[in-house]
């Protein structure tokens, strides 16, 4: 729309909207999960430090107890997962896909917020525009009422003409409160979208009376292109990818996990701390295999497969709904464009007819009903 005031409102809403803050928090959580999954492929380290007092309660030949001995254990070990079964790789893929799904959900919230702000802003401007238009028509009808009253007093009109003119004025005035209510409702919604109480709506928007206009045709492209841009489609697709990766995570438990590790150990009596003969080391593969629990692992695999099947069904439903919504929106946009062009022509024609009817009535060439009808047609065309 190239409207700086509208752009500023959208920016404020994107910063302050509570739903968007929650979506941003979900994205930060997904980032943390990705870091956690990626960190599983790095070196693991552990440190051991232990000290004990060992006492032998046997007695010597002299009848005294044996003295206690202080011992210690110090160790440092390093392990690195080889990921031969691909479990860590699939876990990372799943977390990345989950993050992309959360990001798509956040994008959907952003689009919804921007669209809601734009609609609320347009509703305020439209309500003011419609009210101003009706007030102009009321002014014309008031002039007609004044003229018919003057004609009646001069003996050239009837009380019926005056009552019909007054009815037209009052009928038009009766529509004004509806525009006020529509404007207030849109302002309250706008305040809520900006993260404020309804009464704290932006005061400068309240007086907006110029309808937002597209500066260029909407770049809709075709239906397929619009669907590819939809965040709900991306979210559903990335959800499938994440849950598919978790099938690999569950399947990997059917096979052993292998790590390579090594460590340095220093233990013995405290007085030997640091001496060469108290050091030792270890190096080799570490094997872990849950083969006794294979039925449990297979159950997890079945559950993961069922989850993906459900995701695919939901994806199909989302795509069908997106196709319906996209085609409906494109058709509505095209027909609204045609309707706007027709209403523009109708408004111009109604304006000419109203002016002609007023002139003919003034010179006694037309009756009052024709004038009131022309003015009503003008009001309807302008409001639409």
What does each of the following model-derived ranges do?
Residues 1, 11, 50-77, 200-219, ...:
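Small/polar, glycine/serine/threonine/aspartate-rich low-complexity segments that form flexible
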Residues 6-8, 71-73, 119, 164, ...:
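Transmembrane beta-barrel architecture of outer-membrane proteins
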Residues 12-21, 28-44, 75-93, 104-111, ...:
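A glycine-/polar-enriched beta->alpha junction
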Residues 16-17, 154, 229, 363:
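Charged, alpha-helical scaffolding/interaction elements associated with membrane systems
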Residues 22-37, 109, 113-145, 149-150, ...:
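Amphipathic alpha-helical coiled-coil segments
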Residues 43, 48-53, 57-148:
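Compact, aliphatic and Gly/Pro-tolerant "microcore" segments centered on a short helix or tight beta-hairpin
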Residues 136, 156-158, 177-227:
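Short, solvent-exposed, mixed-charge loop/turn linkers that connect secondary-structure elements
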Residues 153-182, 384:
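Repeat-solenoid scaffold signature
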């Amino acid at each position: 729309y190239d409207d700086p005031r509208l752009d500023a409102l959208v920016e404020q809403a994107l910063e302050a909207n509570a739903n968007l803050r929650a979506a941003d928090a979900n994205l930060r959580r997904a980032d943390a999960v990705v870091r956690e999954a990626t960190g599983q492929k790095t070196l693991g380290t552990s440190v051991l430090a232990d000290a004990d007092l060992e006492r032998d309660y046997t007695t010597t030949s002299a009848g005294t107890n044996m003295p206690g001995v202080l011992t210690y254990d110090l160790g440092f070990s390093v392990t690195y997962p080889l990921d031969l079964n691909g479990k860590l790789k699939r876990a990372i893929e799943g977390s990345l896909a989950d993050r992309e799904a959360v990001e798509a959900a956040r994008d959907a919230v952003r689009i919804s917020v921007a669209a809601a702000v734009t609609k609320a802003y347009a509703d305020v401007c439209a309500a003011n525009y419609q009210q101003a238009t009706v007030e102009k028509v009321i002014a014309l009808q008031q002039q007609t009422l004044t003229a018919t009253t003057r004609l009646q007093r001069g003996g050239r009109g009837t009380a019926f003409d005056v009552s019909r003119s007054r009815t037209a004025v009052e009928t038009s005035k009766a529509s004004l409160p509806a525009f006020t209510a529509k404007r207030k409702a849109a302002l309250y919604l706008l305040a809520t979208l900006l993260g404020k109480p309804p009464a704290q709506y932006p005061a400068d928007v309240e007086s907006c009376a110029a309808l937002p206009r597209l500066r260029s045709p909407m770049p809709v492209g075709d239906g397929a292109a619009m669907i590819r841009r939809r965040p709900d489609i991306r979210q559903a697709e990335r959800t499938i990818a994440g849950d598919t990766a978790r099938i690999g995570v569950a399947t990997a438990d059917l096979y052993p996990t292998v790590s390579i590790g090594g460590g340095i150990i220093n233990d013995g009596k405290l007085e030997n701390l640091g001496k060469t003969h108290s050091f030792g080391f270890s190096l080799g593969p570490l094997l872990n295999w849950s083969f006794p629990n294979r039925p449990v692992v297979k159950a997890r695999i079945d559950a993961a497969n069922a989850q993906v099947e459900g995701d695919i069904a939901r994806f199909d439903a989302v795509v069908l709904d997106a196709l319906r919504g996209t085609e409906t929106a494109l058709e509505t946009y095209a027909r609204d464009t045609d309707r706007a062009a027709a209403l523009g022509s109708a408004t111009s024609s109604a304006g000419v007819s109203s002016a002609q009817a007023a002139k003919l009535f003034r010179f006694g060439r037309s009756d009052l009903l024709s004038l009131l009808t022309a003015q009503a047609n003008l009001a309807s065309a302008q409001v639409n």
